[in-house]
Amino acid sequence: MEKNKFIKQILTIFVIILEFILFNYSFYNLVTKNYINNYGKGMQEKSINIESYLPFKDDSLIVHESSAIKIVDNIPQIDGATALYPIYSAYVEALYPKESVKYDGKDFLKDSKIQKTGTTVAYQRVIDGETDIIFCAKPSKKQLEYAESKNVELELVPIGKEAFVFIVNKNNNINSLSIEQIKDIYTGKIVNWNQVGGENKPIIALQRSEGSGSQTAMLSFMNGIEMKKSSQSFIGGKIGYSFRYYVESIVNDGNIKMLSINGIEPNIENIRNDKYPIVDNFYMIYRKDNTNENIEKIKKFVLSEKGQKIIEDTGYVSVNGY
């Protein structure tokens, strides 16, 4: 009897576990998987493939440009934002010797003169004096406060222009929002797509990580207006934000689309003529107290016709209009 009772208990536990597994599998396929796939990988963090844009590589996707300026001694280390890596990788190829780039097949070695740590880490590294030059969007309030706490002043040299964009699923019937509508979505005043002419579906307003270039741009866009926290709901239609080049060339996901703002598309022409309402500069950044004389040479090349052509041919808009 005791043995039969024990067997029944084991079978009951097994059935409960099996039901739990089946429930979770069904939930994943019906809800979670749909939530992830229906709106595309573009809403998730995605990094650029280092090797695809590696300098001194024959099949690299970078713009190959020559330079009369060659830096062979006291070479400044360069780092920066993921989305700008194709630009500063091209600068390294144009200006630096091949042996200055050290790559192990997965990542750059510590003593390589080019790194790709991303905006947040790159700002910390340049402020701490661990790298010489970074290419990024403007610093966040916290990054500026960190620099001030270290008694560091940063030099920000504008080198190009880029559109800050909002992205949704390609099947969302909304193609344009006003600036006020976007602000109302992110403050929680607008909570359903039907409030802006879309389907009767809750809006899931996503945010990026603190200190990233996109989050800093979003905080600047909101201009001090507090945003509600990102929704954790499984049901609804997502909206997110990033920079145009990152969405088009790095994420490159056919399941998402960029919204027009006030009826104006975020394309190259509208960025160049400042018709698109959310355009900002990106920068070459270094410490003002950095005494490396080669920084000025790099800046001169970056702002030259060839340096600005690299920006244009990569897919951005140059600040000097070349």
List the predicted regions and their residue ranges.
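Exported/periplasmic ABC-transporter solute-binding proteins
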Residues: 2-148, 152-162, 168-322
